[in-house]
């Protein structure tokens, strides 16, 4: 069942986006910046961590749902797990939409 969830377009789009960002080096500290960059993860790493987190929450929700169907998990845990996964997925979709919107806006800028 998790394989069918993985085919969700938002998950695939975020995965491809994080791979592209990691390959291109977008967000690396080598680019000139007006303000010194604080030590931390690059933009690509953050996106990669986010997609991994969403996938993990979807897996947890699926496992909890299966336990609930078997009668091994209380309904409250099942609902909580599914709602958390849904919220993570909605957040990922919103971030994807903002990234696409920013890309389109930048691509329309005159050079």
Swiss-Prot record:
Gene Ontology terms describing biological process: bacterial-type flagellum-dependent cell motility
PANTHER family: FLAGELLAR HOOK-BASAL BODY COMPLEX PROTEIN FLIE, PTHR34653
Keyword Magnesium among UniProt keywords: no
Disulphide bridges: none
A GO CC term assigned to this protein in UniProt: bacterial-type flagellum basal body
Cellular compartments annotated: Bacterial flagellum basal body
Record flagged with keyword Lipid metabolism: no
InterPro entries: FliE (IPR001624)
GO molecular function, one term: structural molecule activity
Annotated protein name in UniProt: Flagellar hook-basal body complex protein FliE
Protein family: Belongs to the FliE family.
Pfam families: FliE
Principal place of residence: other
Entry keyword set: Bacterial flagellum
């Amino acid at each position: 069942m998790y394989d069918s969830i993985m085919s969700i377009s938002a998950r695939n789009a975020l995965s491809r986006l994080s791979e592209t960002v990691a390959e291109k080096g977008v967000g690396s500290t080598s680019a000139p910046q007006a303000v010194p960059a604080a030590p931390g993860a690059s933009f690509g790493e953050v996106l990669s961590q986010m997609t991994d987190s969403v996938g993990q929450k979807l897996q947890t929700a699926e496992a909890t749902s299966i336990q609930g169907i078997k009668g091994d998990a209380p309904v409250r845990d099942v609902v909580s797990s599914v709602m958390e996964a849904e919220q993570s997925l909605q957040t990922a979709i919103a971030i994807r939409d903002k990234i696409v919107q920013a890309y389109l806006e930048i691509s329309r800028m005159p050079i």
